[in-house]
């Protein structure tokens, strides 16, 4: 619907979000169409990449903004979230807000907390932190349709308009089945920056 042209895309599954990243890569490569030009593919961010971006590269930052949980100044919320019991509209947004409604973080990224939660490429495991390290920074498994549901869970980050301040913290993680779309889950595409060595 045209009224939502500047809102985050929601209701898409992890599989659909991944397919969009692949389509976007193909579209970009066709539009450039030059030999010898390296174009990194679009993809979903890993859980670690997403969290680093949301924390402004600081291990102390719980939220993308400077301090606090966002509830200190009623009528001036830094994100679209549920600031109190049943207070969905207290931040003036009952549903996902338009993109760029709230201030960006220090990296210039908008809505890294609240508004809509976001798919990551990381497979969910309750012991995820133990499975990942510098040599193995991502736990990835692309489940097949025949796999059991427990293998189809993906990490979702950022919280959404329906979540309270605790669940929009950058260190919080949630899970959803990769074939399910939800009205509170969206995605953002990323690309790896290739250094020229200069």
Q: Model regions: which residues?
A:
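Functional-site microenvironments in short loops/helix caps that host divalent-cation chemistry
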Residues: 1-174, 181, 198
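Sequence-pattern detector for short linear motifs
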Residues: 172, 176, 191-194
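Short, structured beta-strand segments at or near domain termini in extracellular proteins/domains
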Residues: 183-197
């Amino acid at each position: 619907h045209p009224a939502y042209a500047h809102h985050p895309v929601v209701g898409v599954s992890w599989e659909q979000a991944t397919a969009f990243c692949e389509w976007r890569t193909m579209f970009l490569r066709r539009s450039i169409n030059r030999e010898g030009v390296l174009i990194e593919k679009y993809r979903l961010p890993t859980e670690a990449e997403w969290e680093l971006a949301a924390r402004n590269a600081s291990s102390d930052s719980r939220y993308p903004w400077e301090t606090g949980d966002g509830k200190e100044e009623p009528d001036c919320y830094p994100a679209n979230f549920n600031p109190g019991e049943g207070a969905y509209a207290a931040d003036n947004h009952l549903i996902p807000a338009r993109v760029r409604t709230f201030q960006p973080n220090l990296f210039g990224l908008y809505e890294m907390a609240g508004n809509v939660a976001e798919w990551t490429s990381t497979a969910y495991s309750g012991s995820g932190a133990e499975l990942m390290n510098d040599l193995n920074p991502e736990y990835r498994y692309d489940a097949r349709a025949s796999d059991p549901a427990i293998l189809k869970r993906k990490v979702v980050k950022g919280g959404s308009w329906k979540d309270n301040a605790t669940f929009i913290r950058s260190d919080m993680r949630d899970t959803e089945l990769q074939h399910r779309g939800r009205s509170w889950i969206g995605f953002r595409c990323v690309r790896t920056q290739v250094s020229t060595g200069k």
